[in-house]
Amino acid sequence: MAMNLLNTASIAKEMQTKVTERMGDWFEAEFKAKANSASRRTRLIRSHGHTYTYARYQNTGQLSSNLKQVKKGDKIVIDAGTRANYTSGYHGMYFLVEKKGMQEVKTTLKKGANYANSMKL
């Protein structure tokens, strides 16, 4: 009788860590790109016969530099830092306060699911 010497538990654990690391890298890069594009986005204000432009979220450029991966047990969390990491105490999470930002989070999560399903190890 031949015994199967494959340790499936260790193989599954290794696969889980590889998938978690790749997904963490992918989400970090994706959210940094979204934060950079938000920092360049301008708003048009029409007032008193003139048109003014200004960057609505000027500190979101800081958001992309403050995003980092934090390993918590078996999981990887993308952390945006605290208010102290930003100038003027502004946290920079435009994703939570603007409709366009919330839509970008939804599409990024959908893309993440598709990326996980199409990942080749």
From Swiss-Prot:
Domain of life: Viruses
This protein's record includes keyword Nuclease: no
Keywords, ordered alphabetically: Viral release from host cell, Viral tail assembly, Viral tail protein, Virion
GO biological process: viral tail assembly
Localisation per UniProt entry: Virion
GO cellular component: virus tail
Primary subcellular site in the record, as a coarse category: virion
Family according to the record: Belongs to the Skunalikevirus tail terminator protein family.
Function: Plays an essential role in tail assembly by capping the rapidly polymerizing tail once it has reached its requisite length and serving as the interaction surface for the connector and the tail tube proteins.
Quaternary structure and interacting proteins, as annotated: Homohexamer. Interacts with the tail tube protein.
Name of the protein: Probable tail terminator protein
Organism listed in the record: Lactococcus phage p2
